[in-house]
Structure formats: C-alpha cells, structure tokens
Amino acid sequence: MIKKLLGIAPTPTEDGAFAPSRLALKLATSATTNYDGGAYPTPYTGRNARILVVLTEERNMTMANGKKFSTGNHPVEMALPMLHLISAGFELDIVTPTGAPAAIEMWAMPKDDAAVIKLFSDYADALKNPGSLADFAAKSLSDDTPYVGVFIPGGHGAMLGLPDNADLGKVLRWAHGKDIHTITLCHGPGALMSAQQDGNFIYDGYEIALFPDAVDKQTPMIGYLPGHMPFELGVTLKSLGL
C-alpha cells in the first residue's frame, strides 16, 4: 500500500505481468527524444545497402522472485538507430525468431516525438508481420549478400528468446565471418550469447558497452522492475570473454 501511495509499486498488466511504476516511468522515460534528423549529406547509394533488424517476439521476463516484467524491444533504442540508418541511405528488413509480431515496450514510447511515431507508423505492418529469422538463417546466408549489417536493439526483451536462439547464432557467425557489421546496445548484447558454438565464442576478446548490472540491481527499489534480474547479463558476458 505504501509503495502504491508513493508511486513506486510496479503497475500490473492485463496478462499478469508488471510494467514499471509511475515514478520509474517519470525517471526513465520521456515524451520526446533528442533525434535531430541525422546529418548525412551524402547518404549511401551502393548496391549492398540492407540491414537485418532482429527483434524479440517475447513479452514477459520471469524475475528471480517469480514475478513477470512486461518488456520487449525498447521503442527508443529500436527507433533512433533505425532512423539514423534510414537517413544514412540503408534499407531495413525486420525479423523475429518465428515471424510472430515484435513485442514493443509501449510504456516507453515517446508519444510526442513525431519522428519516432512516424517510424512506428511506417513500419506498423513489418512489426506486426515480420520476416522469420529461421527462414533467413536457412535461405539467405549467401556469399553474395546485400546485407551490410545486423541490428539488435535494446530492451530487456533482447534477453528473451534470442540468447539461446540457434538461428540467430548461425546468422551472427555468418555475419562475423563476412565482416558484416553487428550493431547492438543496452541489453541487446545479451543476444550475442547465441553465437556460442562447440565451446567457442566469436566475440571472445571483444569489448562492448551495455546496461550495467549494478543499475539493474537498483531499479526494483523504484519499481522499474518487479524483482531482481534472473541473471546478471554483464557477468555472464564477461565469463564468455567479452
């Protein structure tokens, strides 16, 4: 009751999970972003100009206490890189593991940001009916590829259904071998765990930036998360050599 009065109680969702508390939303989200349209006076015009955008289709993360956190792909961490890539001349193809609709953290949507809202409108069908990562892994890993990048956005949802996805691992190892760029941020690096194979990890020795475990440990206090994380992402990735 006290947490509810103070606005730090996680907000129940219709499916039995929890979204962030009122205070957490006030502290961690914004109605607008700092996107300025990008600065790309000479956009890329080459033949190979496609980016594969890999999104999670899973919604709820089970926390250490058994409660479920309503998550998905973070709209800002997804939209702003996409906007920059589009402005720089690239075309985007969206996939989820099975082709099911992409899960979006709608509670984090910057509702007054015209550029972000337009992007979600433009890609509404692609988000509802994305391509299948499984099909891509089976049919599109060619030597003569139009793809120059793989983008995995952030959001705690990137830790659901992607870290152990064999198809994603196959795509990442292919991209790595072809010197295709891999782009990810915040909790997105969790998906890189899928690239493990036979005790080898292609990113062993690399350095990355990701959301700190120390912050994830603190956010339950303000109701951003309904419980502590099921595992420490930074510690886990470091154990693999990152």
Task: Give short role names for the model-derived ranges.
Residues 1-178, 191-242:
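Extended, subdomain-level signal for the structured scaffold at the beginning of enzyme domains
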